[in-house]
Each structure stands twice: as structure tokens, then as C-alpha cells.
């Protein structure tokens, strides 16, 4: 079995995360600095990382300049605290969106920030981001909404008051087309949420899953997609045709490519080895 197929260096490495730096809606102190090392994510990042990487953070809040400036500094420190070397951490928002999108291929690591899915999607469309990603060979990390917007067709799960009850709200919208997998983040925190009097999962998401497949993941879990391989690392659930089932647990890996649970690799180098 293959945990991840790495036949070539020159291809996009896509990390779809829920939260790579903490637990959503939790004030509990972290026992690590930098990115969450759970389920081998830091090891995998280090395996793909290039020294002195040029990094770009694309904001989900394109008009919140002061927030974005602070976030840029925070992620610069997070990368450093993880033990990854970088030469820059730039921000992309409404001040420079098209300029940074045009320069996308000059970066080695691109973060798609978390926030409100439709708002972020509209910004991505405005700067032509989907086209700019064509042929990109670096690392892309989606965070929450950023992971959701990576899909070819995005499931914009209702989140804000009014969205579930509004018949004009679009639940399926065009995405970046980096993956065909629909990620639902923060399952640990939102599984009991209620939006407009409807249970987020049972009354909204399950019915929306008919003819679709969603993957609900908890914070610390991630999907790693490379050429010919897509593997979920950590606790995850599949929602399809209204049926909810757990497919993976913490410390294990599940191949979406092969549809089977597989052992967790002992080291990043074992990603290249078949068993």
C-alpha cells in the first residue's frame, strides 16, 4: 500500500487542514509552538520544505488590513517556531491582490486563510486566483474556509444567521479546482451547532450530501494531496447520501485514493515506500 505517491518533486503539495495551529473555540493552552505536529503534519511539511522559502498568506478578510498585518506577523513566527526557514512572509489582500496573484509562482508556500467561505471565494475570484494556480509546484496549505475553497465545487456550508433560511443563499459555488474533495472543518467544535433553528449537521449538511461526499475533520487532522494520492491523516468522517460514518482516527491514515485505512508512516521518507 502507498501512503502517498511522491514520484516527482515538481508538483503541488496540498495540505487541507481544519486548524493547523490550535483548537477552534478552545482557550486551552497548547503544548507545542508553531504548527500542530499531530498526525505527522510537521514532519510532512519539513519533508517538502525548501530552505529560505518564500511564503504568501492570502487573507479571507481582504479589507481588514490591520487584522491581516497582525496575522502576517503571527504566521511568520509560527513558521519559524516550527523550525522551517523562510525568506519572507507576504500578505495578499485588497491592497495588492492582483499583484500578488500574478506573482504566485514566485512563492514556495502559500497559505489560504480561514474565514467566511463566500467572502473568501469572492476575493479569490476577483484576483483570478484559480487561473494563477495552474502549474504551481510549491506547497499550499488551506485553513478552514481556505481548505473548503480549494475544491472544484465548494460546499459553502451555512454558517451565519440567515444563511440556512435564505433560499437565495448558494450552498454550492465554484472553487479553486485544486481538489475534488470537500472538507468540512472544525467538526469537533461545530457538530452540535444550530443555524436558523436547524441543526447544522443533521438538518442541513446530511440532506445536502445526497449525490455528494463531504469529509468532516477535527482540528489537528489534515488531507495531504500530491500527484495521484490523497490521504487523510487523523480523525475524520465521511458524509455521503445522508449517511455519516467515521473513516479514520487520530494517529492513523486513510487513503481516499484507495478507499482503505492504512498504517501511519513512521517518517516522511516512508511516504515514498510502498508496502
Please state what every model-predicted region is.
Residues 111-113, 134-153:
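Catalytic nucleophile loop
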Residues 12-50, 156, 160-275:
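C-terminal and late-domain segments of enzyme folds
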Residues 5-6, 11-109, 246:
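N-terminal beta1-alpha1 cap of cysteine-dependent amidohydrolase-like domains
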Residues 71-73, 124-129, 197-200:
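Charged helix-capping and loop-helix junction motifs
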Residues 115-117, 146, 188:
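Short glycine-rich anion-binding loops that position phosphate/pyrophosphate groups of nucleotides
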Residues 103, 126-138:
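Catalytic-core regions built around general acid/base machinery
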Residues 117-126, 194:
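Glycine/threonine-rich flexible loop motifs
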Residues 52, 107, 136-137, 179:
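Short, well-ordered alpha-helix to beta-strand connector turns
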Amino acid at each position: 500500500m502507498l501512503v502517498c505517491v511522491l514520484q516527482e518533486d515538481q508538483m503541488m503539495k496540498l495540505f487541507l487542514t481544519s486548524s493547523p495551529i490550535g483548537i477552534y473555540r478552545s482557550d486551552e493552552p497548547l503544548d507545542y509552538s508553531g504548527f500542530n505536529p499531530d498526525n505527522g503534519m510537521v514532519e510532512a511539511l519539513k519533508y517538502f520544505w525548501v530552505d529560505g522559502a518564500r511564503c504568501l498568506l492570502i487573507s479571507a478578510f481582504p479589507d481588514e488590513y490591520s487584522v491581516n498585518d497582525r496575522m502576517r506577523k503571527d504566521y511568520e513566527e509560527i513558521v519559524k517556531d516550527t523550525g522551517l526557514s523562510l525568506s519572507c512572509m507576504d500578505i495578499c489582500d485588497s491592497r495588492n491582490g492582483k499583484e500578488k496573484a500574478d506573482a504566485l509562482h514566485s512563492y514556495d508556500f502559500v497559505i489560504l486563510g480561514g474565514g467566511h467561505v463566500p467572502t473568501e471565494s469572492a476575493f479569490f475570484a476577483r484576483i483570478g486566483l484559480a487561473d494563477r494556480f495552474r502549474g504551481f509546484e510549491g506547497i499550499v496549505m488551506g485553513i478552514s474556509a481556505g481548505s473548503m475553497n480549494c475544491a472544484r465545487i465548494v460546499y459553502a456550508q451555512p454558517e451565519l444567521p440567515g444563511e440556512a433560511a435564505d433560499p437565495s443563499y448558494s450552498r454550492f459555488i465554484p472553487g479553486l479546482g485544486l481538489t475534488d474533495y470537500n472538507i468540512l472543518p472544525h467538526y469537533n467544535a461545530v457538530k452540535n451547532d444550530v443555524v436558523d433553528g436547524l441543526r447544522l449537521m443533521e438538518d442541513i449538511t446530511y440532506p445536502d450530501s445526497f449525490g455528494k461526499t463531504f469529509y468532516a475533520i477535527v482540528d489537528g487532522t489534515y488531507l495531504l494531496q500530491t500527484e495521484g494520492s490523497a490521504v487523510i491523516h487523523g480523525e475524520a468522517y465521511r458524509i455521503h447520501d445522508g449517511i455519516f460514518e467515521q473513516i479514520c482516527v487520530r494517529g492513523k491514515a486513510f487513503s481516499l485514493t484507495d478507499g482503505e485505512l492504512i498504517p501511519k508512516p513512521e517518517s516522511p521518507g516512508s511516504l515514498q515506500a510502498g508496502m
